Design a protein with these regions (language model features):
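Short secondary-structure boundary/capping segments
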Residues: 29-32, 55, 287-290, 316-320, ...
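Conserved ATP-driven motor cores of ASCE-family P-loop NTPases powering translocation/secretion/packaging/pilus
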Residues: 261-365
């Protein structure tokens, strides 16, 4: 469903996915439009040109440090309970201080990770206390959360460790500590028709995963899009930026997504997102955030496979009712009579929504009546699919070769 959109978009594109398929189906076409890069800590598409990006860059600005810390920590768990929220907010308060201190003192994510492993290390607090450009009392905030009651402190630092877990891998850390001149240029990206793919596996239960890194990068890019749009004619990007967030709750749960959906279109930022069910949005952004996302989403496409009875019933009610006339005939001594009864029935039932045909979507668009739409796959364009399938196979082979170079060498030798 998403591949044709990515292939045809005329402007810059930010694309997320938990599988390499979307990259393999669209990357070759995107190269024809502009540079293609991947932020791919799990090596789902290792043949792609890698993004080098430092989460510390720009954090001399306390507002940037705060937003980046929020994005990193928010993506580390989907428990919306009050205790979990307290620990996440406290961890973000510590992390924003670490990022701010690292940027002010010319340090890197290696230092941030080291400080998080040694909460009693006074270095970040000293940097903040001695630097006149620091935010007000962020050093004290770090001290409050790292030297308080043991149970509270351990909870905060466990949450922080989960948010930074992916940086413990040497290849990921190397990716996030670019040399001078290697840092991903966001402004250059937005001025082109380039593409960046953010790829990562679904995190397993209890694991930190790569979602924090991908989310922080996406948030940075969308923040930059708003800034650049403000200086453009009409205060919007033209052509627009496409932010296509497949599996958004799992791999790229941008904290500000509800707000981005509400006002992105006016800035030339087209946000599309995919999820398994509405319940995922409630788990990740909370009931209020999920409701705000739903209200700000102009077009919703529901595909087969939804299993939650509550969600199915909500959709049935949303589609409304229609009046049906039923005719019944009866014979009697006096002759035949016809009775007409009028009843209200759902336009689309729970059973019909749950068992939609493959390739058919229930489309809800603003206040227009819902429709069932056929969504043709790329393969149905026989002429075009022949070329696309060749491109896909070549990209997949390149990925396989990059994952297993030794095996490829043996095959060539034999």
């Amino acid at each position: 469903m998403f591949a044709p959109i990515v292939r045809q978009h005329p402007g810059p594109a930010l694309v997320t996915s938990t599988k390499p398929d979307l990259f393999e189906l669209s990357a070759t076409e995107r190269v024809r439009r502009g540079p293609v890069r991947v932020l791919d800590p799990d090596r789902l598409a290792p043949s792609g040109t890698r993004v080098r990006w430092s989460p510390v860059a720009g954090c001399e600005d306390s507002r940037v440090a705060e937003r980046r810390a929020q994005a990193l920590v928010a993506a580390s768990g989907d428990d919306t309970g009050s205790t979990a929220q307290f620990f996440r907010q406290s961890a973000a308060d510590v992390l924003k201080g670490y990022l701010h201190a690292a940027a002010l003192d010319g340090r890197t994510m290696r230092d941030v990770l080291a400080w998080s492993a040694r909460p009693t290390d006074p270095t970040p607090m000293r940097i903040l206390a001695e630097n006149p450009g620091t935010a007000v009392d962020w050093a004290g905030t770090i001290g409050t959360h790292t030297s308080g009651a043991e149970q509270t402190t351990s909870g905060v630092m466990r949450t922080l460790a989960r948010a930074l877990a992916c940086f413990g891998h040497s290849d990921v850390m190397e990716m996030c500590c670019p040399a001078p001149g290697e840092q991903f240029d966001v402004d250059e990206f937005l001025a082109s028709s380039a593409t960046v793919y953010l790829l990562g596996k679904q995190p397993s239960a209890g694991a930190g995963g790569v979602a924090p890194l991908l989310t922080a990068f996406a948030e940075e890019l969308l923040d930059a899009a708003e800034r650049v749009a403000a200086g453009r004619s009409g205060r919007r990007l033209d052509p627009p930026l496409l932010a296509l967030l497949d599996e958004a709750p799992s791999i790229c749960p941008i904290p500000s997504l509800p707000q981005r959906l509400a006002d992105g279109r006016g800035r030339g930022v087209v946000v599309m997102y995919g999820m398994q069910s509405p319940a995922q949005a409630r788990d990740r952004w909370g009931p209020n955030g999920a409701e705000a996302m739903n209200d700000a989403t102009t077009v919703s496409v529901i595909l087969r496979g939804l299993r939650s009875v509550d969600d199915l019933e909500d959709l049935e009610r949303l589609c409304g009712q229609c009046r049906i006339q039923r005719h019944s005939k009866s014979d009697s001594v006096g002759g035949r009579s016809v009775t007409v009864a009028s009843e209200l029935e759902p336009v689309v039932t729970v059973a019909e929504i749950r068992s939609l045909e493959v390739g058919v979507g229930l489309v809800l668009w603003d206040d227009f009546p819902q429709v069932l739409a056929y969504l043709p796959g790329l393969w149905e364009d026989r002429k075009g699919w022949k070329a696309i399938s060749v491109e896909e196979a070549a990209t997949r082979a390149a990925n396989d070769a990059a994952r297993h170079p030794a095996a490829l060498t043996r095959i060539l030798v034999e």
